[in-house]
Design a protein with these regions (language model features):
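Conserved beta-strand-loop-alpha-helix hinge of the TIR/SEFIR fold
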Residues: 76-96
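Short amphipathic alpha-helical segments
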Residues: 24-26, 89-93, 113-115
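Catalytic core of DAGKc-family lipid kinases
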Residues: 37, 48, 56, 94-99, ...
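Glycine-rich beta-strand-to-loop/alpha-helix junction loops that act as flexible
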Residues: 16, 80-82, 103-105
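ATP/NTP phosphate-donor binding region
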Residues: 1-77, 87, 123-126
Length: 149
């Protein structure tokens, strides 16, 4: 049997209203930087119109992700927006091996700041392209997962 690897699929779920519309404005540059920085990757982008849609897109991406095989990058879920999007991505990828990329584009971006993700949206994209990863501890609060460094 021959296995063919087409490269990883990155699913980017975006809250375009985050940061007063900032996420929508920077999305073209984010997608360019991801595609240039990860030339073998496929990028699927979903601009969501509601919390429910964003949640479903995150869950679907995590469920459909292919794991890494020797010498390759795994399919990944990327979320872009404010702390609410970070929370959705975290809950979708928890208890899986699916890598989660966080791209802050909200107003405060407290979650990313607490994890040491600095440099705003461009810095987060550079970190994703570099392949840097970190595991974080999770706790459950009223049935929902929360993460921290």
């Amino acid at each position: 049997m021959t296995l063919h690897y087409d490269g990883p699929t990155l699913t980017l779920v975006v809250n375009p209203a985050a940061g007063g519309g900032r996420a929508r404005r920077v999305l073209p540059q984010v997608t360019r930087d991801l595609l240039i920085g990860l030339p073998g990757a496929s990028l699927r982008v979903f601009q969501t119109g509601s919390f429910a849609e964003a949640r479903l897109r995150c869950i679907a991406a995590a469920e459909q992700a292919r794991p890494a095989v020797e010498g390759t990058m795994a399919d990944s879920l990327l979320v872009m927006g404010g702390d609410g999007m970070m929370h959705l991505g975290l809950n979708a990828c928890a208890r899986t091996q699916v890598p989660l990329g966080l791209i802050p584009a909200g107003t405060g971006n407290d979650f990313c700041g607490g994890l040491g993700i600095h440099g705003g949206t461009p810095g987060a994209v550079r970190t994703i392209v570099s392949g840097a990863t970190a595991r974080i501890d999770l706790t459950s609060v009223r049935g929902k997962l929360a993460g921290g460094a």
